[in-house]
């Protein structure tokens, strides 16, 4: 590393080299920078090689042209009579910046000018360099802009995606309004094999049990953002974006082989976070709620979701909650990500578990539960190497997690064992075991 006189010689040679390098001068160069802050005071500073490239040489006089309102300002070359500032050059110690010891700088520290041209909540500014003009404009503070929209309107409006209708039904009972609902049941392999199209089933379930104003029966991967933006323009601001992203490919219930196969045929749900994040950028909700299985938290998809939301300005809270700690019958753990423009979200505190036996709930439905003792799937439970859910018995104090395959009578479904017989829980019993309100209609 050159020092002393050698350092000066090194810098001099570097400047000579820069003079003869065939640098192409573009029409426009842009940057996005943060204000330099000293206490409560802000400085607008651009330290860049591109200033020189675009014609703003060290020693040049410049003048400021304020924009309209708080729209920033422009900088143009100026003569001695009109100049208010000057372009200068910063020299770095060769030890720390030997590859680039010189850099051209424009700086503005007058608080009157800055406060007149940039809102107080602005944290960053955009720089557009052209030949003979540099334009500084404020970059909107996303979190502030979102929060500001709810000063004169209710925040209890939601964009709800992929819930099957249950979450919306409960939300409406709590005073929320589902302005826009995105609901579409993906076509599964068993649907294709049987020639069925059930893409509207969850959507119809939503309409039976809730009152969305706008219903989008579209695949989350193919929803056009321009159309979504146009629909949002017809709505009041959205306070909550609620996503129950597909959990199959994060769940231990799906085999590694099936997960690989779903990647090949594009039925995987791992990448649902990508369209969800793009939609959140358009919806601009004050709060985002993502619900999934616990494995989602440690997955690449979960990391991408959380990191991107933090970059957007949201404060992140993650938690894994067990239904038994909140009055449910199922020992079902779910992961929740709450991303809010308001800091300080406090997760709900677990309640004391009831601890009583579950049989009174089961017994009143037992007459409607089918006897499936002789089914092959029941016999297969004894020979499989996989861990099967425990039978519901007179001694049970909780219910294992009920999967979406429950109704198909698979071997790892939840069953009742009593008096030497095996029973398949009825629809009404499953609804009660899953703590789905009686008011939720599944009879249609």
Regions found by a protein language model. Name each.
Residues 147-284, 294-298:
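Core alpha/beta nucleotide-donor-binding catalytic domains of modification enzymes
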């Amino acid at each position: 590393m050159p020092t002393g006189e050698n350092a000066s010689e090194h810098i001099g040679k570097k400047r000579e080299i820069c003079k003869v390098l065939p640098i192409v001068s573009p029409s426009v160069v842009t940057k996005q920078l943060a204000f330099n802050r000293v206490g409560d005071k802000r400085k607008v500073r651009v330290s860049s090689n591109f200033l020189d490239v675009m014609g703003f040489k060290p020693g040049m006089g410049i003048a400021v042209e304020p924009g309209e309102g708080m729209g920033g300002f422009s900088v143009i070359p100026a003569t001695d009579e009109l100049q208010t500032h000057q372009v200068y050059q910063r020299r770095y110690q060769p030890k720390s910046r030997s590859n680039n010891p010189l850099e051209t700088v424009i700086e503005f520290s007058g608080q009157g000018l800055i406060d007149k041209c940039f809102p107080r909540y602005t944290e960053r500014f955009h720089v557009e360099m052209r030949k003979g003009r540099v334009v500084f404009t404020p970059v909107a503070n996303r979190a502030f802009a979102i929060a500001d929209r709810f000063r004169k309107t209710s925040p209890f409006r939601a964009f709800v995606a992929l819930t099957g209708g249950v979450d919306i039904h409960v939300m409406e009972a709590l005073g929320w309004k589902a302005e826009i609902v995105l609901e579409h049941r993906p076509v599964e392999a068993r649907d294709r094999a049987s020639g069925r199209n059930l893409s509207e089933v969850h959507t119809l379930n939503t309409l039976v049990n809730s009152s969305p104003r706008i219903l989008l029966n579209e695949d989350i991967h193919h929803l056009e953002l321009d159309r979504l933006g146009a629909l949002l323009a017809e709505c009041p601001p959205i306070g909550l974006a609620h996503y129950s992203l597909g959990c199959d490919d994060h769940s231990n219930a799906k085999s590694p082989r099936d997960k690989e196969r779903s990647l090949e045929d594009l039925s995987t749900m791992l990448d649902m976070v990508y369209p969800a994040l793009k939609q959140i950028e358009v919806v601009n909700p004050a709060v985002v709620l993502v619900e999934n299985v616990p494995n989602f938290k440690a997955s690449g998809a979960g990391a991408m979701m959380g990191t991107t939301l933090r970059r957007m300005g949201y404060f992140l809270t993650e938690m894994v909650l067990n239904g038994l700690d909140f009055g449910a019958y199922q020992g079902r753990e779910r992961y929740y990500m709450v991303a809010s423009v308001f800091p300080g979200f406090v997760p709900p505190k677990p309640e004391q578990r009831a601890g009583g036996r579950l049989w009174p709930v089961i017994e009143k439905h037992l007459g409607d539960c089918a006897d499936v003792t002789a089914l092959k799937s029941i016999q297969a439970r004894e020979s499989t190497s996989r861990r099967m859910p425990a039978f519901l018995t007179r001694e049970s104090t909780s219910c294992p997690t009920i999967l979406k395959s429950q109704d198909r009578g698979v071997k790892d479904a939840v069953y009742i064992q009593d008096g030497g017989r095996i029973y398949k829980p009825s629809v009404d019993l499953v609804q009660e075991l899953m703590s789905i309100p009686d008011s939720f209609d599944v009879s249609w």
